[in-house]
């Protein structure tokens, strides 16, 4: 176990955590339960879509060659010999100057090679027979959805790691996936430490605070794609805390503890990691908030020791835990996207370490604007409610003025980044 707390750069801390990343195994779920899950394997087309030539419009199926002389001055008439809707197939084959009334989605009948939209025709009856006339020529293939034009048999439709959206469910249903192969969600255990913690429903008491971190991390875990398992809060007693952590490790894929990672008299996580024989990857990161964030590895499991301060806990989860969950789910871009934004108000604080300022980012006139929200203190809760990004201010800088371009991590975006830290490393040298 590391005894000395030597801060390491943020990107190095992320790299150490990612060294122990895993990929989850496959489970099958009903199509209706697959929304927001991640595909565990590639989905390949087992048939063409469309599976047959079909009409994209309501109209008439004709032979294009019969329209060659059609014009305003010389309308060409066709005998309508059949009428078919979607799901029906005409048993008749078209001869010269014959047409079949066809509905959207219906299969093109034998002999036809073009579809005339109904609004371009004039229908009429003559001697008990149905006819239509048109005044323009058509080419072979006009207004026909060709077999396989949407998807070819054998083509890869979706790659593993794809997040299931409503559009993806439509594609899965098209190819008969009543059950869908998805990645099993990792179970993320959550333990809150601290004698000062009250349950959310408890009335306030002198010297006590409500346990907001557990609810926050629980929600973050769901948003990241995991199954959270709240394992309760434990008091600042070493033996009880150790027993609780050891028991929790039997039930989860990853374990998060909040609080107890600093150097106070009742911060027992370092001692717990030592008793577990854990390999401590780091116990101090050169960042604000969350410098005391600690991550260890024991029994093939990552143990995340997040700060007890809400903002620091929140940042620690987004930077270190979320990418591990996303990688488990086969997401090849598991990190938050890094982008440039314009700072909208002064931020005078010095930055001895890299600072992650909770911010609200929005688009305006083709630019991203970033506005710090709430108090920039690790204990702040109010700054988290409106934040959709972190402004990254490199260590060693002092104060940023409104109008300056800064780097931001977009933490609410569904899409991710493969590795944003090289950009941040460059920005710290500017």
From Swiss-Prot:
Binds 1 Mg(2+) ion per subunit. Its cofactor is Mg(2+). It catalyses: adenylyl-molybdopterin + molybdate = Mo-molybdopterin + AMP + H(+). Its EC number is 2.10.1.1. Keywords: Magnesium, Metal-binding, Molybdenum, Molybdenum cofactor biosynthesis, Transferase. One of its GO terms (cellular component) is cytosol. Pfam families: MoCF_biosynth (PF00994), MoeA_C (PF03454), MoeA_N (PF03453). Pathway: Cofactor biosynthesis; molybdopterin biosynthesis. Belongs to the MoeA family. Catalyzes the insertion of molybdate into adenylated molybdopterin with the concomitant release of AMP. This is Molybdopterin molybdenumtransferase.
């Amino acid at each position: 176990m590391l005894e000395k707390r030597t801060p390491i750069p943020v990107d190095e801390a992320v790299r150490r955590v990612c060294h122990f990343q895993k990929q989850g195994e496959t489970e099958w779920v009903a199509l209706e339960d697959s929304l927001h899950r991640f595909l565990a394997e590639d989905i390949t087309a087992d048939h063409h879509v469309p599976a047959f030539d079909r009409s994209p419009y309501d109209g008439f199926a004709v032979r294009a060659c019969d329209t060659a002389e059609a014009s305003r001055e010389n309308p060409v008439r066709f005998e309508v010999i059949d009428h078919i809707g979607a799901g029906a197939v005409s048993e008749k084959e078209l001869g010269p100057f014959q047409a079949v009334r066809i509905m959207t989605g219906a299969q093109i009948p034998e002999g036809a090679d073009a579809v005339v939209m109904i609004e371009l025709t004039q229908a009429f009856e003559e001697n008990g027979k149905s006819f239509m006339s048109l005044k323009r020529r058509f080419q072979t293939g006009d207004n026909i959805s060709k077999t396989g034009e949407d998807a070819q048999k054998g083509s890869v439709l979706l790659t593993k790691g794809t997040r299931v959206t409503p559009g993806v469910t439509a594609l899965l249903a098209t190819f008969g996936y009543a059950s869908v192969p998805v990645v099993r969600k990792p179970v993320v255990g959550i333990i809150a430490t601290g004698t000062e913690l009250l349950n959310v429903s408890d009335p306030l008491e002198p010297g006590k605070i409500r346990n907001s971190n557990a609810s926050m991390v629980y929600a973050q875990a769901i948003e990241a794609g995991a199954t959270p398992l709240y394992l309760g809060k434990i008091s600042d007693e070493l033996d009880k805390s150790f027993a609780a952590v050891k028991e929790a490790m039997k039930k989860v894929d990853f374990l998060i503890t909040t609080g107890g990672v600093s150097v106070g008299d009742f911060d027992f996580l370092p001692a717990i990691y030592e008793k577990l024989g854990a390999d401590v990857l780091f116990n101090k990161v050169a960042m604000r908030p969350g410098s005391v964030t600690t991550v260890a590895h024991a029994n093939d499991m990552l143990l995340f020791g997040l700060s007890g301060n809400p903002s620091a806990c929140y940042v620690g989860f987004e930077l270190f835990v979320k990418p591990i969950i996303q990688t488990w789910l086969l997401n090849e871009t598991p990190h938050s996207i890094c982008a440039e934004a314009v700072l909208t108000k002064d931020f005078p604080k010095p930055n001895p370490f890299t600072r992650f300022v909770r911010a609200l980012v929005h688009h305006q006139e083709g630019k991203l604007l970033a506005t710090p929200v709430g108090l920039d203190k690790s204990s702040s809760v109010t700054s988290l409610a409106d934040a959709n990004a972190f402004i990254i201010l490199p260590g060693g800088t002092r104060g940023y003025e409104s109008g300056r371009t800064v780097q931001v991590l977009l933490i609410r975006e569904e899409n991710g980044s493969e590795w944003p830290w090289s950009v941040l490393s460059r920005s710290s040298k500017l």
